[in-house]
Amino acid sequence: MAITSTHTDEKWSELFQKPYVQILNGKAVRFSDVMVHSFPMGDVEDPDLYAGQPLWEWQESEAGAWVVEHAHDKPYWVRRTDFYNYGFRYYVFARLTESDQVYWQLRWGNK
């Protein structure tokens, strides 16, 4: 699976890595993290196991395949407790260039 997880219960400010600038082909390119997908998960015994199917479906969709292809590092997912719905909410983050962020936002955006 191309999407990994290294974060679980941090604060929102700790989920995003700091933006940075890197020189690629003689041009300065800015990279930053973007939330590219989210979905709810009910109160199940092993939510990470059940989250595999929606993560895989999104990864195989047009938007997910584009993000996996254009992400600078592997996209990663985060599980957060959803107190309003008595379950969990999963978020997928990807590190993209500014131009890729604009393209992604115009094409798919956060729905």
Q: Which role fits each region the language model picked out?
A:
Residues 76-111:
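Short, compact, well-ordered microdomains
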